[in-house]
Amino acid sequence: DGRPVDSIQAGDEAIVILDRTPFYGESGGQVGDTGELHGLDIRFAVADTQKLAGQFHGHSGRLEAGVLRRGDTVSGSVDAARRAATVLNHSATHLLHGALRGLLGTHVAQKGSLVAPDRLRFDFSHFQPVTAEELAEIERRVNSEVRANHPVVIREMGMQEAMDAGAIALFGEKYGERVRVVAMGESVELCGGTHVGRTGEIGLFKLVSEGGVSAGVRRVEALTGQAALDHVAQEERRLREAAGLLGGTTADVADKLKALLERQKRLEREIELHKAKAASGATADLVERAVDIDGVKVVAARLEGLDAKALRDATDRLRQQLGSAVVVLAGASDGKVALVAGVSGTAMGRIKAGELVGFVAGRIGGKGGGRPDMAQGGGQDGPGLQAVLAEVPSWVGSKLSPG
């Protein structure tokens, strides 16, 4: 609860403050260290480390054993594997920043970052999405710096001397008269974080995502070291699986997929042609079956195998062929019904397509609406559909002769 105490018991959660510590406190985007504090019969599990008031380190965690009192002497044991993975990502972040500025322009400025053991995230100013080609070049440049195995040189110097040396400072960050400068290859930045000894220790750098955060701010995420290798291996497994499904090798996945998509488009065109022919054949029969009510031809029918588009085409064709007409067509699939209604000629103004489709849809558990001359709707398939379609001529008659 934030109150200072003189001691804690096993099972208590607390923030322990030490006069000095090997733990890194979260700062500059780099997450705080985890590990353990040990003393005589004392074991405190550190889940996070934060900087307090800019100078103290707060070790957050839980006392697993013993009684920890104010003034006790303890030793710290940092989770070395977690720190090592975090270090790779922090040094890679510096190389990434340099590659972004080198390729996209010096307007690129850091707007936020996360340096964690499992990944790195970098937010930066840029006016448009980074293209796939640009991302590939950025990744290539960073890996080139990794392979160059540059030594990472860390020095403390005066702020003006650092600026004269070309060091990049973070906008809005507060610095003292003495600053810590981290240089690796062409990258020179002010930084208080932990880093590799040489860039080659990063092993591999792999970009995994790019997107927008806000207006003028982009975000990239990346992996390094073993995490990057694991990601590449997973992508290769997926590629092999895709190749197997396509009946080819990883080298011809793109060609196989392109051929499959072209075949799908061709089949879709053939299906549309078949539907058009079916609609054309159906309309010829429906013209003969149209009912004449006060000089208006009325057609209400169910057509098998036609979707909403085919129903619209058939309705348009019937309106053209019948002149003054009221048409409502239904197509059923998987228990669902698509409805299209159309009105033309002298029926216009007296019959509204939206009202007609609403009448039919309402009887089959659905709804619909649209323009006075053309409307759409839907509902559930069942015996009620044929029954309501049979009532359409009388419904039209009541509208044409309301008295």
Listing of model-derived features with the role each one plays in the protein:
Residues 1-403:
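A glycine- and charged-residue-rich anion-binding loop/surface
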